[in-house]
């Protein structure tokens, strides 16, 4: 039986535009799914149903219908303020009080015409790829004994389970790509500075940038176009990327056309190999092999490339710790209520000297220069997105040092794209076989890392893989519930 959530975000937008469904009807459909299904998934921490209905009903009076996401239901990652709604930040350490103003990313999505259904779950302050917090557990819809990854945990689960047609997350070390890979989605981390509302210059190292989580490559292009479109709002970040796009056309067009022949490097090794025991599951290797096979059939050149052996891991850890050191300054915070991992990161961050932080930043700058140089002859570099299958609930444990090491071993290829500012996309090329020790049908993704400003090439290659592997037809059980 056909239902509205079976449509892609692009198709749904077109339906609304042509009058085959109203924004309110679409909003009601998705709210009903959230009410029926989310208790077993934990994608949302707050559902603002009445506010969503009121906005959808009056959307034509609030936002021009020409806006790129007009009428599409969405949700806000619970790290970003929406006026009148509490921002929980995945923590029990803060009082539950309504935010006074919208974060620029939230305002940009409103300006694009979306209808927010509420706030989606994130681990504490977005500082982990876990999906377990003191506020609750977010579960993977492909196997609810397993985690969806993080930190855009709730956003990924909501899209995969058909609770929203698409979502925007933020990615400071893999936080869009990790949960997208674990839940069978496309996840795109744009180049640093590409998205004006969140240009990647806040926080130490300029690591974080907003990006889409979608079921198809074309939907990812559509959301990226919306994120970079002028909003009519005051410019929050005057230093956003200004690479001219003249003649290249919208990102959506690149994703739909899927044209081009490129040179792809298949990466051997990771930047964490000297520090963490990175064990790559055969299913992760099989995903890369499947992608290599299809890319070769399409006509791309495929070569091996070795990971440069330059310092990285300790400097990244210092950057992560130093970003946690600011948390004691958050108004009203109760540090005794922090989870063990974040409390440990805060303590280590506060013990750092300014010289140590500056040295780490210098090391990461040198790493970026070396990495971009090593990748320069390729249009994209291919890695597994995750080294392992989606992790069981509780796998990270309570020891913070081991927790951090496990995060790095699980996603050893994601954070280097944040450090270098390069765009990267995860693509859900396969699932585990039935005879896999962790069970069959678990999503496995590959990552393509592009050149600076190279999102269109990543989207084009993703579209070529999608046409042949047809992952957009693969869904978890909740899809038909």
Show where each model-derived region lies.
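An N-terminal boundary/leader segment
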Residues: 1-53, 268, 297-299, 350, ...
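Glycine-rich, small-residue loops and helix-cap segments
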Residues: 19, 71, 111, 164, ...
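Acyltransferase
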Residues: 20-28, 57, 250, 280-305, ...
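Residue-level signal for inorganic ion chemistry
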Residues: 30, 52, 220, 264, ...
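Acidic/His- and Gly-rich active-site-bordering loop/insert found
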Residues: 52-54, 62-134
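Short helix-loop capping/hinge segments that flank enzyme active sites or metal/cofactor-binding pockets
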Residues: 65, 69-89, 258-271, 275, ...
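Short glycine/serine-rich loop segments
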Residues: 101-231, 418-431, 436-447
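A short helix-breaking turn/cap at a secondary-structure junction
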Residues: 189-285, 468-481
């Amino acid at each position: 039986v056909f239902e509205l959530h079976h449509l892609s975000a692009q198709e749904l937008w077109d339906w609304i535009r042509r009058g085959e469904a109203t924004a309110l009807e679409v909003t009601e459909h998705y709210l009903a799914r959230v009410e029926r299904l989310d208790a077993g998934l934990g994608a949302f921490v707050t559902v603002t149903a009445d506010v969503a209905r009121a906005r959808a009903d009056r959307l034509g009076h609030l936002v021009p219908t020409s806006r790129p996401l007009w009428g599409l239901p969405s949700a806000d990652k619970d790290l970003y303020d929406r006026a009148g709604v509490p921002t929980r930040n995945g923590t029990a350490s803060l009082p539950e009080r309504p935010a006074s103003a919208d974060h620029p990313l939230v305002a940009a999505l409103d300006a694009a015409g979306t209808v927010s259904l509420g706030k989606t779950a994130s681990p504490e302050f977005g500082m982990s790829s876990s999906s377990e917090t003191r506020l609750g557990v977010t579960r993977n819809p492909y196997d609810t004994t397993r985690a969806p990854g993080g930190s855009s945990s709730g956003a990924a689960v909501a899209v995969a389970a058909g609770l929203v047609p698409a979502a925007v997350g933020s990615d400071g070390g893999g936080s869009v790509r990790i949960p997208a890979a674990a839940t069978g989605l496309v996840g795109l981390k744009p180049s640093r500075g590409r998205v004006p509302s969140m240009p990647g210059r806040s926080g130490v190292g300029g690591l974080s940038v907003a990006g889409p989580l979608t079921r198809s490559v074309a939907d990812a292009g559509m959301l990226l176009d919306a994120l970079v479109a002028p909003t009519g709002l005051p410019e929050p970040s005057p230093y956003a990327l200004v690479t001219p796009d003249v003649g290249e056309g919208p990102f959506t067009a690149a994703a739909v056309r899927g044209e081009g022949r490129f040179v792809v490097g298949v990466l051997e090794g990771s930047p964490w190999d000297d520090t963490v025991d990175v064990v790559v599951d055969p299913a992760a290797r099989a995903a890369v092999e499947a992608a290599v096979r299809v890319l070769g059939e399409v006509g791309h050149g495929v070569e091996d490339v070795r990971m440069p052996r330059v310092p990285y891991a300790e400097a990244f850890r210092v950057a992560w710790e130093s970003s946690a050191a600011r948390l004691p300054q958050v108004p009203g915070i109760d540090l005794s209520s922090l989870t063990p991992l974040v409390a440990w990161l805060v303590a280590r961050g506060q013990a750092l000297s300014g010289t140590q932080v500056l040295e780490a930043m210098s090391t990461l700058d040198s790493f970026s220069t070396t990495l971009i140089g090593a990748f320069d002859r390729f249009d994209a570099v291919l890695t597994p997105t995750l080294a392992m299958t989606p992790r069981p609930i509780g796998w990270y444990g309570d020891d913070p040092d081991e927790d951090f090491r496990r995060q790095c071993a699980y996603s050893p290829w994601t954070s280097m794209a944040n450090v270098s500012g390069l765009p990267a996309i995860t693509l859900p090329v396969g699932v585990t076989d039935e005879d896999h020790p962790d069970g069959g049908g678990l999503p496995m993704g590959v990552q393509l890392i592009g050149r600076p400003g190279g999102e269109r090439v990543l989207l084009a290659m993703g579209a070529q893989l999608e046409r042949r592997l047809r992952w957009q037809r693969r869904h978890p059980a909740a899809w038909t519930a």
